[in-house]
């Protein structure tokens, strides 16, 4: 029998809902992002035999666990079918609702003048603004102690470099927690190096509204590391040389890091050639291939992601 998992879109926020789905044969529930650590612990206590999964990293919807209609309204692309256009992150102007006795506000999207959307605001902020990204790596040990079975990283529309780097960092935190080691704060810095919209702990703990929302910037903030290439193969009869498919600009003299499942390698690029064996100093545009000299000793490297770092 194929196991059935319940999507976060079902908005499971309490033990009664978990038991309801368990009685109908589901094997795992992905809990709503809006739950606190205490609420998650209570659900686990009341539902000891159900697999529970929680989101710990990635983009956050402004709507309740992704139940958003903005993308469908503006562009006829359903956010709940993987086609979200991130309408919540567009540039809006706020207008007083002069005809509204409640004293509310209207939003006007920059490219749709004259189309006004009513919004509501309370002590927690405006529900249509740009959310920061979730980052809960510092809470993994507590979530593991609670008894969560699986952690989920939101990676839709992200590159496989982003997913690989994020998963690698969270794996380090999981292994440290299993070994009863203290949380290593440098993992927070590693995640800062990735492109992000600013980070928040989400609803795991209670914060003021400005902790959750990014009111100043719509666009993703570029990190201090950039994915510049992907390993295609080792160069025959040339020890340490790898063929790289170029993704972004890099050059001789850059500080690089090679991400691999068996461990990362940091080095300064000293030699690069085109596919004809002619020395070059700057990688050509995206999609081209180059050969570079690395500290790799293996003779049959088939996978790796190349990252340019600062310093």
Where are the regions that the model predicts?
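Active-site pocket-lining/capping segments in soluble small-molecule metabolic enzymes
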Residues: 1-12, 16, 30-150, 157-234, ...
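As written
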Residues: 25-26
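Basic, amphipathic alpha-helical/coil surface patches used to engage anionic, phosphate-bearing ligands
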Residues: 239-240
């Amino acid at each position: 029998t194929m196991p059935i998992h319940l999507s976060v879109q079902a908005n499971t926020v309490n033990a009664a809902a978990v038991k309801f789905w368990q009685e109908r044969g589901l094997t795992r529930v992905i809990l709503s992002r809006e739950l606190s650590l205490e609420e998650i612990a209570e659900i686990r206590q009341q539902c000891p035999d159900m697999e529970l999964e929680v989101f710990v990293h990635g983009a956050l919807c402004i709507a309740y666990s992704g139940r958003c209609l903005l993308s469908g309204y503006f562009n006829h692309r359903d956010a709940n079918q993987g086609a979200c256009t991130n309408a919540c992150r567009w540039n809006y102007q706020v207008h007083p609702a002069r005809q509204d006795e409640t004293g509310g506000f209207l939003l006007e999207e920059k490219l749709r003048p004259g189309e006004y959307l009513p919004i509501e605001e309370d002590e927690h902020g405006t529900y249509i603004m740009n959310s920061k990204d979730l980052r809960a790596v510092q809470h993994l040990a507590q979530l593991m102690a609670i008894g969560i079975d699986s952690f989920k990283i939101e990676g839709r529309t992200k590159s496989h470099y982003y997913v690989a780097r994020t998963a690698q960092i969270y794996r380090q935190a999981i292994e440290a927690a299993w070994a009863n080691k203290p949380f290593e704060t440098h993992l927070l810095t590693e995640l800062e190096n990735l492109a992000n919209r600013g980070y928040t702990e989400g609803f795991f703990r209670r914060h003021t509204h400005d902790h959750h929302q990014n009111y100043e910037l719509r666009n993703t903030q570029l990190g201090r590391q950039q994915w510049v290439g992907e390993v295609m193969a080792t160069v025959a009869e040339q020890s340490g040389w790898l063929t790289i498919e170029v993704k972004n600009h890099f050059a001789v003299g850059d500080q690089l890091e090679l991400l691999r499942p068996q461990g990362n390698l940091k080095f300064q690029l000293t030699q690069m050639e085109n596919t004809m064996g002619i020395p070059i100093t700057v990688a050509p545009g995206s999609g081209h291939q180059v050969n570079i000299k690395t500290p790799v000793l293996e003779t049959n490297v088939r996978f790796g992601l190349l990252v340019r770092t600062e310093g």
